[in-house]
Swiss-Prot record:
This is Serine hydroxymethyltransferase 3. One of its GO terms (biological process) is tetrahydrofolate interconversion. GO terms for cellular component: cytosol. It comes from Colwellia psychrerythraea (strain 34H / ATCC BAA-681). (6S)-5,6,7,8-tetrahydrofolate binds at L131, G135, H136, L137. PANTHER family: SERINE HYDROXYMETHYLTRANSFERASE, SERINE HYDROXYMETHYLTRANSFERASE 1. It is found in: Cytoplasm. The modification N6-(pyridoxal phosphate)lysine is found at K240.
Length: 431
């Protein structure tokens, strides 16, 4: 039955689509959709969500305020959003074998902030991985809130193999007696030994927090050790390898920690949860529970190995000499290149990545000596080993062109761009 409105203004408000009401925003969205269709996405922290996830996020749930938690809200009319949030919680519990899950954090950074608000106090010592070694801003980097509010000490990697220096972690923990130790990061290409971190935390009586934002999809598929049996608390994003909407989760098996976390998220750090995003999280987590997700992660890892191997054959230096995960770091110093100019050249060739500091990097953060590459988005698109071998060759062509013609690499860029666009036409995104 067609709705009847009492005025033309109301009919327009409830019936007009975006293209007819705000052409400027529609144009920007269309341009971004075209970019995603026509470029190969290798940013390791990005992925491509399903149409169902996008549909859930663009629903009437965006209208609903729901401060509090299921069954304990500060507003009426929450019975249906309670169902949605409970679905998200139960699915996350099942995936990660967690007793308690908070699905309300708006981002991974806010999930980390809520954990710190709950479990440590300003001035306490925290021990996390340094940003240049592969850590994350929220783990105590100076520009971040965690670096300003806490006495942040940082561990790094060994110079000989660029892997986490667990001996240094132990030595720093004994020396500084941190209240919290943080494991995880944003550019760690090898598996993390959470059991080792637990041993170190126990030696000094520290809380162990694991940030598994990058590897949550791997953990969900059984392709990486689950941190839950070892950590006091675990945080993650819901995008990246989980292939959901942008958002965060906090997980724990400790009921006392769970109570503190819930209070820290609301009312401590956030107000009303984003129920439309939580619905999208629930849908994405439902997809993770399907057998096809395990096959997807298996392909992500296989593609990463192929890409790393191809780049090595093209003379690239891969940090840690390979990858166990979905990402890799390319050290550009042997080629005499910088991360920023390489990122720009690759983007002109239709390949999107990000400049990234490498361990012991002497360049500024906006310059860097490396790039970070990841395979989740390309794998979601349908790329397999053959496609990632081609991509590795194309990256090699762009880098070689940049070495030979640092002032104007347009010939190599245009040649690769044509090949990229032909490949992308074979693997379209949303219909």
């Amino acid at each position: 039955m067609k709705n009847t409105y009492t005025s033309g203004e109301l009919e327009q408000f409830f019936s007009s689509d975006l293209s007819s009401t705000d052409g400027a925003v529609q144009v920007a969205i269309d341009l971004e959709e075209a970019r995603q269709n026509q470029q190969i996405e290798l940013i390791a922290s990005e992925n491509i969500v399903s149409k169902a996830v996008m549909e859930a996020q663009g629903t009437v749930l965006t209208n609903k305020y729901a401060e509090g938690y299921p069954g304990r809200r500060y507003y009426g009319g929450c019975e249906h959003v309670d169902l949605v949030e409970t679905l998200a919680i139960d699915r996350a519990k099942l995936i990660f074998k967690a007793d308690f899950v908070n699905v309300q954090p708006h981002s991974g950074a806010q999930a980390n902030g809520a954990v710190m608000l709950a479990l440590v106090k300003p001035g306490d010592t925290i021990l996390g991985m340094s940003l240049d070694a592969g850590g994350h801003l929220t783990h105590g980097a100076k520009p971040a809130q965690s670096g300003k509010w806490f006495n942040a000490i940082h561990y790094g990697v060994r110079k000989d193999d660029m892997r986490i220096d667990y001996d240094q972690v132990l030595a720093l923990a004994i020396e500084h007696q941190p209240k919290m130790i943080i494991a995880g990061g944003s550019a760690i290409p090898r598996q993390i030994d959470f059991a080792k971190f637990r041993e170190i935390a126990d030696q000094v009586g520290a809380i162990l927090m694991v940030d598994m934002a990058h590897i949550a999809g791997l953990v969900a598929a059984g392709a990486h050790q689950n941190p839950l049996p070892f950590a006091d608390v675990v945080t993650t994003t819901t995008h990246k390898t989980l292939r959901g909407p942008r958002g965060g989760l906090i997980l724990t098996n400790n009921p006392d920690v769970a109570k503190k976390i819930n209070s820290a998220v609301f009312p401590g750090l956030q107000g009303g949860p984003l129920m439309h995003v939580i619905a999208a999280k629930a849908v994405a987590l439902g997809e993770v529970l399907e057998p096809s997700f395990g096959a997807y992660i298996k392909q992500v890892l296989s593609n990463a190995r192929v890409l790393a191997s191809t780049l090595q054959q093209r003379g690239c230096d891969i940090v840690t000499d390979g990858t166990d995960t979905h990402l890799m770091l390319v050290d550009l110093r042997p080629k005499g290149l910088k991360g920023n100019t390489t990122e720009e050249s690759l983007e002109r060739a239709g390949i999107t990545c990000n400049k990234n500091g490498i361990p012991f990097d002497s360049e500024k953060p906006m310059v860097t000596s490396g790039i970070r590459l990841g395979t989740p988005a390309g794998t979601s698109r349908g790329f397999g080993n053959d496609e990632f071998e081609l991509i590795g060759q194309w990256i090699g062509d762009v880098l070689d062109g940049l070495v030979a013609n640092p002032e104007d690499n347009s010939v190599a860029e245009q040649k690769v761009l044509q090949q990229v666009q032909q490949l992308c036409l074979r693997f379209p995104l949303y219909s």
